[in-house]
Each structure stands twice: as structure tokens, then as C-alpha cells.
């Protein structure tokens, strides 16, 4: 085979590999779209560990500072305004709130493939200190001890980056060996020119962490940015279980 033929063969192989990657990405995007096209419902709020539902479907949780946009992201993800209650008052979510696709009885193996868990925010709340401390214990106990929890999406406000209490939660997840991935919220609130730098800075702060799943997903609940990427990431996760 001549050198020219070798080059052409290498180019064709690279093109075939790129096509295969694109096809796989498109398939995941479609799986994510179909999963979240279903009607989703709220099933329970959990004020303490003893009220957790029986372990069954894969659970993914959304963690983050108060007012980072967890509830808004869940609503945008499932395409259902008002499913997760939102508020401009930090600390509005006071329980572990469970959401699942509708149409499953929950009995005799008729379980949904996935449960979304909206967690109380950390860092600030307009509530008595004792109540805030109780929420904090609930969050940490859940993160450490729930065997069906397969991924935590740690939401970071794009305008502020990773703060001290975010890093403390990442430390906890690393120590507990709970897989997590960073999701930037409100990406539309910063200038587009600043996004690459933000992604680079966030990557530098997280890529060496033991339990951090690679890849940072930048989202906007208001504009819909990054939602397809997040749905595809969840679809990929479900393939493992």
C-alpha cells in the first residue's frame, strides 16, 4: 500500500469513527428526550431519613446552594412548569422531594426507571438555625447512605462559580464515593465570551476529584441551554443499571 493509500485509509477510518460517535450521541439524545417526554409526578416529600421510599429505581439527586436553581432545572428538564416548587426566597425546598414518571404502580416490580430528587439547598436559608441544621443533616445522611443513589448533579451558579460550601459538599461526595457531575446553572446570565474561561476554571477545580464524573454541563432553565446534554447524560447513566 502506497503512502497516499495509507493516508486515505487513515482519513476514512477517522471519519468512520467520528460518524460512530455522532450516531451514539444522537441515540443518547433521543433516549433522553423520550425519557423526559413522559409525564412526571411528585410522589413524596421526605423530611427525615425514616420517611424515604423503599429502595427501588435508580435515583439521581440535584444538590446545590440555596437559590442555585434546582427546582427550576427539574421543571425545565421534564418540561412541566410548577412540578418542583420554585421561589425567589432561598431555602424554600425543605425536604427531599421525589419525582418519577407517571404510569407505574410501584408494586410487583412495576417500578419507574428513574427517580429525581430535589434536595434542600445549602449555604443559606430564611429559617431558624435548628431547622437549617436539620436539613443539612438530612442531606448529608442521604448522600452517605442511599444505595440506590447513582449520581448527584451538583449545581453551581455560573455567576459565582464554586464557593467554599460547594467544595465542602464535593469533599463529602468524594469521601462517600458517591458519583457526581458538575452542572452550571444560569449560564445565560454571563457573557458568552466568559463561558470558556468559566468552564476551564471549573474543570481545574474538579478534574482531580475522586468521585467527579468527567464533563461539565452548562445549562439555562430559562433559555433551555444544555438541557438536551443533561438528558443525554442521564440516559447514559441509566444504561449502566
Swiss-Prot record:
<keyword id="KW-0131">Cell cycle</keyword>
<keyword id="KW-0460">Magnesium</keyword>
<dbReference type="GO" id="GO:0005829">
    <property type="term" value="C:cytosol"/>
</dbReference>
<feature type="binding site">
    <location>
        <position position="71"/>
    </location>
    <ligand>
        <name>Mg(2+)</name>
    </ligand>
</feature>
<feature type="domain" description="EngB-type G">
    <location>
        <begin position="56"/>
        <end position="240"/>
    </location>
</feature>
<keyword id="KW-0717">Septation</keyword>
<dbReference type="InterPro" id="IPR030393">
    <property type="entry name" value="G_ENGB_dom"/>
</dbReference>
<dbReference type="GO" id="GO:0046872">
    <property type="term" value="F:metal ion binding"/>
</dbReference>
<comment type="function">
    <text>Necessary for normal cell division and for the maintenance of normal septation.</text>
</comment>
<protein>
    <recommendedName>
        <fullName>Probable GTP-binding protein EngB</fullName>
    </recommendedName>
</protein>
<keyword id="KW-0547">Nucleotide-binding</keyword>
<dbReference type="InterPro" id="IPR027417">
    <property type="entry name" value="P-loop_NTPase"/>
</dbReference>
<feature type="binding site">
    <location>
        <begin position="118"/>
        <end position="121"/>
    </location>
    <ligand>
        <name>GTP</name>
    </ligand>
</feature>
<dbReference type="InterPro" id="IPR019987">
    <property type="entry name" value="GTP-bd_ribosome_bio_YsxC"/>
</dbReference>
<keyword id="KW-0479">Metal-binding</keyword>
<comment type="similarity">
    <text>Belongs to the TRAFAC class TrmE-Era-EngA-EngB-Septin-like GTPase superfamily. EngB GTPase family.</text>
</comment>
<dbReference type="GO" id="GO:0005525">
    <property type="term" value="F:GTP binding"/>
</dbReference>
<feature type="binding site">
    <location>
        <begin position="91"/>
        <end position="95"/>
    </location>
    <ligand>
        <name>GTP</name>
    </ligand>
</feature>
<keyword id="KW-0132">Cell division</keyword>
<dbReference type="GO" id="GO:0000917">
    <property type="term" value="P:division septum assembly"/>
</dbReference>
<feature type="binding site">
    <location>
        <position position="93"/>
    </location>
    <ligand>
        <name>Mg(2+)</name>
    </ligand>
</feature>
<feature type="binding site">
    <location>
        <begin position="219"/>
        <end position="221"/>
    </location>
    <ligand>
        <name>GTP</name>
    </ligand>
</feature>
<dbReference type="InterPro" id="IPR006073">
    <property type="entry name" value="GTP-bd"/>
</dbReference>
<keyword id="KW-0342">GTP-binding</keyword>
<feature type="binding site">
    <location>
        <begin position="64"/>
        <end position="71"/>
    </location>
    <ligand>
        <name>GTP</name>
    </ligand>
</feature>
<dbReference type="Pfam" id="PF01926">
    <property type="entry name" value="MMR_HSR1"/>
</dbReference>
<feature type="binding site">
    <location>
        <begin position="185"/>
        <end position="188"/>
    </location>
    <ligand>
        <name>GTP</name>
    </ligand>
</feature>
Amino acid at each position: 500500500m502506497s503512502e497516499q493509500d495509507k493516508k486515505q485509509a487513515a482519513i476514512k477510518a477517522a471519519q468512520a469513527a467520528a460518524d460512530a460517535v455522532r450516531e451514539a450521541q444522537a441515540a443518547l439524545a433521543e433516549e433522553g428526550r423520550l425519557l423526559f417526554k413522559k409525564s412526571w409526578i411528585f410522589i413524596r416529600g421526605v423530611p427525615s431519613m425514616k420517611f424515604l421510599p423503599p429502595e427501588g429505581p435508580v435515583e439521581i439527586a440535584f444538590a446545590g446552594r440555596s437559590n442555585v436553581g434546582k427546582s427550576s432545572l427539574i421543571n425545565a428538564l421534564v418540561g412541566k412548569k410548577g412540578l418542583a416548587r420554585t421561589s425567589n426566597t432561598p431555602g424554600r425546598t425543605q425536604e427531599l422531594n421525589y419525582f418519577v414518571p407517571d404510569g407505574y404502580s410501584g408494586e410487583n416490580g412495576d417500578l419507574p426507571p428513574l427517580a429525581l430528587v430535589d434536595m434542600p439547598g445549602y449555604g443559606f436559608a430564611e429559617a431558624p438555625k435548628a431547622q437549617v441544621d436539620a436539613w443539612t443533616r438530612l442531606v448529608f445522611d442521604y448522600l452517605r447512605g442511599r444505595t440506590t443513589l447513582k449520581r448527584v448533579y451538583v449545581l453551581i451558579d455560573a455567576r459565582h462559580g464554586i464557593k467554599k460550601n460547594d467544595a465542602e459538599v464535593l469533599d463529602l461526595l468524594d469521601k462517600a464515593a458517591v458519583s457526581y457531575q458538575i452542572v452550571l446553572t444560569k449560564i445565560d446570565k454571563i457573557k458568552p465570551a466568559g463561558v470558556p474561561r468559566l468552564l476551564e476554571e471549573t474543570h481545574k477545580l474538579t478534574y482531580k476529584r475522586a468521585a467527579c464524573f468527567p464533563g461539565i454541563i452548562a445549562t439555562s432553565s430559562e433559555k433551555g441551554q444544555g438541557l438536551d446534554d443533561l438528558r443525554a447524560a442521564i440516559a447514559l447513566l441509566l444504561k449502566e443499571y
